[in-house]
């Protein structure tokens, strides 16, 4: 049970986000009954956003995303017990799109958070700007798919990749703290977790391999910077979770050995079974999402 002092601290910290989170004329009430069991916030790795998909809210989500597979296996799919506000291009706080604050506001407006909420899962950070560099990891045309200049350790200095040196646990924790505090206050019984990213490319190697439609197999021989960024983000999420007193779901460990171009890849290309109506290249495929859903269900007892 959370102490009164803890709740007072949370209330003070919530002032700024509450102004954004509540629709006009709505009164905030902590611990509302009848909230969602499972709430998910995230980006395209969460939504597995189809390249050619469409949704009324502008955030297409594949039936094969790990949240949808999780909801189906727990019989929450199609019920008020499951709220997924993840969106392609979602960020922690970069840009004016579906940041975590915007997603939290959207979920709160749907009555997602309350004393009945059991798990709130947050997967974000890959699309954000880090440090002095204005570069982003996605879209990848400025770096990962630039065969001429590559995506080496100098890419961040050239604003073609986030500054991986700036990706730390303390910085990550500071950027998500407001949302985590809000969730803890309005869903006091929920287990809150940062969800990591899958093994996109094997760590510790200089090159990155991708299977793309028409083009075929593409190898970026200078991908040290991109892979370093993925490694730093993994470490930062784990450390941030510890600093915030929440959980970390190590998706990289779950998907180890199934990187892009492996014998059994769980990272999609854009051909065959990896339909543009189902997902995006260099994103999780149905098999990878299924494995994550199974592990998350077991861990959180859903």
Q: Predicted regions: what is each one?
A:
Residues 88-107, 260-276:
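Charged, often glycine-rich, active-site loop that binds/positions anionic groups
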Residues 198-302:
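Catalytic His-Asp segment of secreted/periplasmic serine-dependent ester chemistry enzymes
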Residues 1-31:
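Secretory targeting and sorting signals
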Residues 29-89, 140-145:
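Serine-esterase "nucleophile elbow" of acetyl-processing enzymes
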Residues 71-78, 174-193, 229-250:
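A structural motif corresponding to the C-terminal end of an alpha-helix
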Residues 25-38, 99-120, 178-191, 297:
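Short amphipathic alpha-helices and their capping/turn segments at secondary-structure boundaries
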Residues 49, 100-167, 199:
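Oxyanion-hole/transition-state-stabilizing segment in secreted/luminal serine hydrolases
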Residues 37-42, 46-48, 81-86, 118-123, ...:
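Structural recognition of the beta-strand scaffold that forms the well-ordered cores
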